[in-house]
Amino acid sequence: CIKLSTIIVYKTEQSKMNEYRIKAYAKINLGLDVVRRLENGYHEVKMVMQTVGIYDVLDFQRTAGGIVITTDSGELPTNEDNLIYKAAKLMIEKYHITEGVKIYLEKHIPIAAGMAGGSTDAAATLKGMNRLFDLGCTLKDLMELGVNIGADVPYCVMGGTALAEGIGEKLTPLAPAPDCYVLVAKPDINVSTKYVYEHLDAQEIRKHPDIDGMVEAIAEESLQGILDRMENVLETVTVSAYPIIQKIKDRMKELGAINSLMSGSGPTVFGIFVEKDMARRAYDKLEEEQ
């Protein structure tokens, strides 16, 4: 009998990974508050983030050199302006990788929708490069690198349910939110996050969401407590500019959602349902009405 501790596995050149596939999950904001505008132009936020089951798929392949991005989406750049490219370049430069990478993005998360589609693709790229080139980075390492790409990237590396503070980079993992069904709808408009924050006057926010109360409700596994505290101060800007968002929120409630909210800077709206069948019927109805 051999003790497991005495077994050593020697890595050979043939064992290196040449291809890797990873899913990049979208997020919604169960609650979003803007505390104040910072001197550097950013905003201090306090929000509860939640991963949802909508995801992009990224395929990685080793190459002799360079970074090549391809995608089935005709709406995204494939050059240095793409966050996937920026994340891959960051990893190559940081860890002195001498080879290149080809990355194919299968896009499912709506673009410019307030669901962190670009950020989660960047986070998946950090993870994918780590695995493909066997870099040995910890989750903490990747989260710290992610700050250099975007404020939501560290959260997207971590995923799950979390409290985000600072500019979104200070994260506190929370217990998983209670089981429920989430229906997501995006009107046929794109919203610039930059536009929303530029038009938000943080000093004029009269009612702030009860984020601390929501965190307590999550700890107590109280779905009703979470639903009662669902608020997003960015709605004051985005809904004013695009009234269709409020119409979708109201329609979701008419179709059985216990509550509905705009995610992030919008325009995506999500509704929370207790019963799967009701969520499915609401989906069918919204599809029929669009």
What residue spans do the PLM features occupy?
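ATP-binding N-lobe of GHMP and related small-molecule kinases
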Residues: 6, 10, 17-113, 131, ...
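Short, conserved charged micro-motifs
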Residues: 41, 68, 276-282
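Solvent-exposed alpha-helices and their adjacent loops that cap or buttress functional pockets
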Residues: 50-51, 147-148, 154-157, 173-178, ...
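Glycine/serine-rich anion-binding loops at beta->alpha junctions
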Residues: 104-133, 151, 257-273
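Contiguous, small/hydrophobic- and glycine-enriched helical/loop subdomains that border
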Residues: 122, 126-163
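Conserved, helical-rich catalytic subdomain that frames metal- and/or nucleotide-binding sites
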Residues: 158, 163-259, 274-277, 284-287
